[in-house]
């Protein structure tokens, strides 16, 4: 469902945010934007295609300016651990597996708004947290996440690939 995000009165730019899936008539535009802005993320999109996911597209003057895609999954099994539970309830997370903003649209708050949309949707879906992984060198992405309050855990994978695992807690464990 489209929602207006901002209007620039000087240039009459119309920006809207929509949720798309593979049946959306403009799905190919997302794939084209993915190929142009973040081709290294395509394997993660294709790998997760068999799981329920949500794609949020931000349109600037009716063109895909940025997107964020996440899956809702139990916390644990993705890293070969048993599902985490709290008080007998299995915890779920919104795991971001694709996020990019066209180079020409960067620096306008689009990436921040997309991240905020995921946080809002994840809360509405009953997720315990939002999780995301990013390679080192993605400083704009890191800046957005850290500015929004995500926690960060740097890590190195077996092939000496350095990255950061980001977590945004959504629910408190307070007993009060």
Residue ranges of each PLM-predicted region?
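Short amphipathic alpha-helix that is part of the acyltransferase structural core
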Residues: 2-43
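C-terminal "cap" of GNAT-fold acetyltransferases
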Residues: 4-12, 154-176
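Hydrophobic beta-strand residues of extracellular immunoglobulin-like
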Residues: 53-57
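Conserved acyl-donor/pantetheine-binding loop and adjacent beta-alpha core of acyl/acetyltransferases
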Residues: 61-64, 69-98
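Residue-level recognition of the GNAT/N-acetyltransferase active site
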Residues: 97, 102, 106, 133-135
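Conserved acetyl-CoA-binding loop-helix of GNAT-fold acetyltransferases
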Residues: 101, 107-120, 147
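Conserved active-site alpha-helix within GNAT-family acetyltransferase domains
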Residues: 112, 124, 136-154
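Conserved GNAT acetyl-CoA-binding A-motif
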Residues: 122-134
């Amino acid at each position: 469902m489209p929602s207006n995000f901002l209007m620039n009165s000087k240039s009459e730019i119309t920006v809207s945010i929509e949720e798309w899936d593979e049946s959306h008539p403009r799905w190919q535009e997302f794939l084209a934007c993915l190929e142009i802005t973040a081709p290294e993320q395509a394997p993660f999109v294709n790998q997760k295609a068999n799981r329920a996911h949500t794609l949020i597209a931000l349109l600037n003057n009716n063109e895909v300016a940025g997107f964020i895609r996440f899956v809702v999954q139990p916390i644990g099994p993705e890293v070969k651990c048993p599902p985490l539970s709290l008080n007998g309830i299995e915890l779920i997370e919104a795991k971001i597996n694709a996020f990019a903003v066209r180079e020409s649209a960067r620096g306008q708050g689009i990436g921040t708004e997309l991240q905020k949309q995921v946080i809002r949707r994840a809360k509405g879906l009953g997720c315990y947290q939002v999780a995301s992984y990013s390679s080192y060198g993605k400083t704009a992405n890191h800046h957005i996440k850290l500015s929004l309050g995500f926690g960060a855990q740097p890590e190195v994978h077996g092939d000496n690939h350095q990255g950061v695992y980001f977590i945004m807690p959504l629910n408190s464990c307070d007993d009060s």
